């Protein structure tokens, strides 16, 4: 935290950092002399330190990203709501810390977004009830309460968010979807906004997409060597289908992005069809579906097949038409990467057959299926060892949850010649699973044993995320 307003500190290239023995004034070669004199006169810093200009940017972002405590803003906002300020126009992309607007509702929303980014929340829920509202963050896959504003503040919060997302603030009877692009402490954040009417007002969910998070590599996703090496071999095949399966929020898209980043976009024509485009991938053409204008997955896929693609990524195979186009594309010399909603890897074959894809086509086109879940990591500050394992406790570092961060557990179903023969014959799912196990496939629960042994998570956490697997 600093004692100087962020906009002034950024413009004048000065950071006043409190310390045990007095404040330190950090400056760069671009800091004007009059600004140094003014800070010295007003705050009497104990010392002066010069840093590189780019280093000062990093220090500014770090210091001021901790000033947006949502709970600290709620009290002031509840007592002074200025609805007229909600209609103020805002720039298309802005850094929240640059905002000098004093309207309490705007300050509160800025604080909520800043704190969510700092806590690495994936979603913000704003839920209305009879006497109050509740704001919750989803962190590491679990929801937790953040603040509970009075009910009188709810409509103002929703209206401001709808303005930021360019939604119709007068329409309160129908669901609406929008998008906000902004920066928080220098980090580009894309926010998908969804509103739905309820009996006590509009409910809002904001999905936060940190664009820098899309630069992950497969090696950082927690895959065992016995999964990473064969998966790397699958995605380097010239044609065929590789699927990633799991429930919503299990990291499927992140895995596909990491796989695409592993491939050479300079020598291959890589195109994606997504709903929505979550992260920008350099060197890759990304297409977003739009149901309002009938730009469906199937329509987009037919179009990109005329774009001379080498590799195609499909955000999700949702229907027979999309599945058939994906299969035909793989049979005509294209590598297709896609996601599918199934509980485990083997059931992906059953799901596609149930959709209406012929087994002989799947046998000819499929290369493999990766199923995955995300498990919470134990907080290293407070975990305790007992009975040969580890237990979550809770401390300030992990917001009393006992967990901090997540990692993946996986099972990789490689379609070898024997399994290909079984698929062609239309054999039962259990026969495919037995053949895969005989070939060395490990289940997600078995994969999770290594994280339990290393003290990274607990047996309860592995069982929680694999109940349906």
Swiss-Prot record:
Induction: Induced by phosphate limitation.
Gene3D superfamilies for the chain: 3.30.450.90, P-loop containing nucleotide triphosphate hydrolases (3.40.50.300), Type II secretion system, protein E, N-terminal domain (3.30.300.160)
Knockout mutant characteristics: Mutant cannot secrete the low-molecular-weight alkaline phosphatase LapA. Deletion mutant shows decreased ability to express outer surface PstS, but not intracellular PstS.
UniProt keyword list: ATP-binding, Cytoplasm, Nucleotide-binding, Protein transport, Translocase, Transport
Single annotated GO MF: protein-exporting ATPase activity
Tree of life domain: Bacteria
BP GO annotations: protein secretion by the type II secretion system
Keyword Lipid biosynthesis among UniProt keywords: no
Name of this protein: Type II secretion system protein HxcR
Organism for this UniProt entry: Pseudomonas aeruginosa (strain ATCC 15692 / DSM 22644 / CIP 104116 / JCM 14847 / LMG 12228 / 1C / PRS 101 / PAO1)
